[in-house]
């Protein structure tokens, strides 16, 4: 099949281009630093720092390669899927909840049901709310709002609720329980998070694509972050809206038929999922043993191992989620992901997995240990003067004239420029692409896109050392055997006082003060280089508190604020109506599963 051969060629070429960019950047950084460090004689610390720079820069280069590939491609709808084709397959939309606000969650379901009602296919879709809530007060509110949801949407027999008595296996176990007991009634299942929202036409189109490709086991969409209000949340939301589609296109080109599963806003073929995705309970205690935490990537790998296509279609629109509004909530969520990704080291060599899936596991691990390489480089640079050999101005015997070390400062400057280029250029190039293609209009125009992009670069530079500190602590906690558990997601405005921010980050202040103090004492020449890292850490409580406040600036405007889609408007209206309702009274237990 020419089309299949072409697809494989594109996938292979994309991977080779990305690898070439990553390796070229890494090799250049390695040799530049090696030459810079050898001006006073090469020592073990110079070699150590060069290796740390090599690993760290290769990771930056790999990320930049996603943007490069994405900039040279465009979203493409699968040729075998007509946008108007009828559908005939019954599909269940799964909404797992765990101690969530039922008003916010159930109003999203009401909005999606209303959006589906605007299509001819609503009766083919059912919703199943799968509660693992442990808080009895929240469970009572879930029952109240479920009954209101049924009544307002006239949804008896289309929207279901069940609450497990024992939440074995967390979210993955919750879905597995439904698949085992009720999955046979539905060929397809859309998996959402509690904060997910999807257009009715998007849900229909996902079913079309599944029907058009019988070997398609899982189809992942790119969720767009919406409804952020705080400065931190809006910055992340803008970056995701502007940059993520381009990075996602690059990712889709590389992954081919062994794509990702991000755990939500995706559709699965129930038979494939049931036959292939039974997750083992890993031997030993958490954090490396027990239930698989980041189950989504493992399930994608198991589907691919069984011969199913796992695809990421970056052209699908109308898929939404909400994100953390402050740095602390982001770090809490990231702590869970860190443990799950490091746990993948136990699965890396499982038999039969595709090579690309193993590489994806490695990428996930590297995403969290990368800060350790940068931290190691900083510490090695502080310690380097103690390992440097004494300067020898007369290295040639009997030569009467001194030989001075060559000045290699330009190489250090070139290295710094190259590293910052890998960090900054992809985002600047994406902003230019948005202006050239007209995409910038949705963000308020070319001028606002450029200003917002520059502001986001400054903002991300300030918070990067704080995020690095949180990630480093998370990795160390996991390596020391500390289980992060299954914390409830915090949703809402996320505003934090300075006292709350201090409680969450005082240890970062301590790290920053110790780091800059040690640098001043042992290697004072490095102080100017480390100030951009140390100052945000020292002032982290203030940074966290200020960025958690509601933003009233026109910066970081994104298209869904300029032109909200029907399902977003419907959700806003339903949520506002429900929030005006009086608090529910006690509601009798209902539809509880004792699995």
Swiss-Prot record:
One Gene Ontology term from the biological process aspect of the record: biosynthetic process
EC number(s) from the headed UniProt entry: 2.4.1.-
Pathway stated in the Swiss-Prot or TrEMBL entry: Glycan metabolism; osmoregulated periplasmic glucan (OPG) biosynthesis
Pfam families recorded: Glyco_trans_2_3
The entry's keywords: Cell inner membrane, Cell membrane, Glycosyltransferase, Membrane, Transferase, Transmembrane, Transmembrane helix
Membrane topology designation: Multi-pass membrane protein
Molecular-function annotations in GO: hexosyltransferase activity
Gene Ontology, cellular component aspect: plasma membrane
Transmembrane regions listed in the UniProt entry: 13-35, 50-72, 365-387, 414-436, 449-471, 526-548
InterPro entries in UniProt: Glyco_trans_2-like, Glycosyltr_2/OpgH_subfam, Nucleotide-diphossugar_trans
Listed SUPFAM superfamilies: Nucleotide-diphospho-sugar transferases
Locations listed in the record: Cell inner membrane
Coiled coil regions in record: none
Purpose of the protein: Involved in the biosynthesis of osmoregulated periplasmic glucans (OPGs).
Family: Belongs to the glycosyltransferase 2 family. OpgH subfamily.
UniProt name for this protein: Glucans biosynthesis glucosyltransferase H
């Amino acid at each position: 099949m020419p089309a299949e051969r072409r697809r494989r060629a594109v996938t292979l070429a994309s991977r080779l281009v990305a690898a070439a960019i990553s390796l070229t950047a890494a090799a250049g950084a390695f040799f530049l630093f090696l030459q810079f460090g050898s001006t006073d004689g090469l020592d073990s610390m110079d070699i150590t720092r060069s290796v740390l720079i090599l690993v760290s820069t290769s990771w930056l280069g790999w990320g930049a390669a996603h943007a490069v590939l994405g900039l040279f491609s465009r979203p493409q709808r699968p040729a075998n899927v007509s946008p108007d084709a009828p559908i005939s397959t019954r599909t269940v939309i799964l909404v797992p909840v765990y101690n969530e606000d039922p008003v916010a969650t159930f109003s999203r379901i009401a909005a999606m049901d209303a959006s589906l009602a605007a299509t001819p296919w609503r009766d083919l879709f059912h919703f199943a709310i799968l509660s693992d809530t442990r808080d009895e007060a929240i469970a009572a509110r879930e029952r109240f709002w479920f009954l209101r949801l049924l009544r307002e949407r006239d949804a008896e027999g289309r929207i279901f609720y069940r609450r497990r008595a024992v939440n074995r296996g967390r979210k993955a176990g919750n879905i597995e329980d439904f698949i085992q007991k009720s999955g046979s009634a539905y060929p397809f299942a859309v998996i959402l998070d509690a904060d997910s929202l999807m257009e009715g036409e998007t849900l229909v189109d996902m079913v079309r694509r599944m029907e058009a490709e019988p070997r398609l086991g899982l189809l992942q969409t790119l969720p767009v972050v919406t409804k952020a209000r705080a400065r931190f949340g809006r910055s992340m939301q803008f970056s995701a809206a502007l940059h993520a589609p381009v990075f996602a296109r690059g990712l889709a080109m590389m992954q081919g038929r062994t794509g990702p599963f991000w755990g939500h806003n995706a559709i699965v073929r129930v038979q494939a999922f049931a036959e292939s995705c039974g997750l083992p309970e890993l031997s030993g205690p958490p954090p490396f043993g027990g239930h698989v935490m980041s189950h989504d990537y493992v399930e994608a790998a198991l589907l691919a191992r069984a011969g199913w296509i796992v695809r990421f279609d970056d052209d699908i629109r109308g898929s939404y989620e909400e994100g953390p509004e402050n740095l602390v909530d982001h770090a809490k969520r990231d702590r869970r992901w860190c443990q799950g990704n490091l746990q993948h080291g136990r699965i890396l060599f499982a038999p039969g997995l595709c090579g690309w899936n193993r590489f994806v596991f490695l990428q996930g691990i590297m995403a969290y240990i990368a800060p350790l390489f940068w931290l190691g480089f900083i510490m090695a640079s502080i310690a380097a003067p103690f390992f440097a050999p004494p300067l020898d101005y007369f290295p040639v015997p009997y030569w009467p004239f001194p030989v001075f070390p060559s000045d290699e400062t330009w190489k250090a400057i070139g290295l710094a420029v190259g590293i910052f280029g890998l960090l900054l250029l992809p985002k600047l190039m994406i902003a230019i692409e948005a202006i050239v293609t007209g995409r910038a209009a949705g963000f308020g125009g070319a001028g606002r896109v450029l200003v917002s992009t520059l502001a986001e670069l400054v903002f991300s530079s300030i918070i990067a050392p704080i995020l690095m500190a949180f990630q480093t602590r998370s990795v160390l906690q996991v390596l020391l055997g500390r289980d992060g558990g299954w914390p409830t997601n915090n949703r809402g405005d996320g505003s934090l006082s300075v006292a709350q921010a201090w409680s969450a980050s005082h240890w970062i202040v301590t790290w920053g003060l110790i780091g800059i103090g040690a640098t001043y004492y042992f290697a004072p020449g490095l102080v100017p280089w480390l100030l951009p890292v140390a100052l945000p850490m020292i002032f982290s409580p203030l940074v966290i508190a200020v960025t958690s406040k509601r933003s009233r600036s026109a910066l970081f405007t994104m298209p869904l604020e300029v032109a909200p889609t029907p399902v977003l408007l419907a959700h806003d209206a339903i949520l506002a109506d429900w929030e005006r309702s009086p608090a529910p009274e006690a509601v009798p237990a209902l539809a509880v599963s004792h699995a």
